Amino acid sequence: MSRRNAAEKRPVLPDPQFNSRLATMMVSRLMQHGKKSTAQRILSDAFGLINERTGGDPLELFETAVKNATPLVEVRARRVGGATYQVPMEVRQERGTAMALRWLVSFSRARNGRSMAQKLAGELMDAANEAGSAVRKREETHKMAEANKAFAHYRY
């Protein structure tokens, strides 16, 4: 265990283009090799595509997609007397949102499509409609927690 103090949590500033903290978090997760402007352009293009296809507010759809992909419970490994149990635990709001964004980005990257913006737009629209890989991952996580409910008393 480290002897240093825990790193101070930095506040997430709203995105200058969309005035949304969630958009800033998404840009951070989209970014590769420190190329923030590229990540911002991908998100902006994805929102443009969503606006074209649905005609609605892309930011609202994005927030709905993140909400639909956010897990409420997860399983964590806990060793008790030589055996490892999958213990279901509640997920804090902050961690749940971070997991949802991570899943949305990773499943967007795994999709086959032309540009990253198109893949991201597709995944966000699917997630907003309670479909897509990110929502399936959340359901899987919830099923795992439900299946291991018997070990809930091992919570720490």
Curated annotation (Swiss-Prot):
- Enumerate the Gene3D superfamilies for this protein: Ribosomal protein S7 domain
Q: Which GO terms describe its cellular component?
A: small ribosomal subunit
Question: Which residues belong to the signal peptide in this entry?
Answer: none
Listed A to Z, the keywords are: Ribonucleoprotein, Ribosomal protein, RNA-binding, rRNA-binding, tRNA-binding
Kindly indicate whether the keyword Heme belongs to this entry.
Answer: no
Q: Which family does it belong to?
A: Belongs to the universal ribosomal protein uS7 family.
Its assembly, as annotated, is: Part of the 30S ribosomal subunit. Contacts proteins S9 and S11.
Classification via PANTHER family: RIBOSOMAL PROTEIN S7 (PTHR11205)
* The name this protein goes by in its record: Small ribosomal subunit protein uS7
Which lineage? Bacteria, Bacillati, Cyanobacteriota, Cyanophyceae, Synechococcales
Q: Identify the gene encoding this protein.
A: rpsG
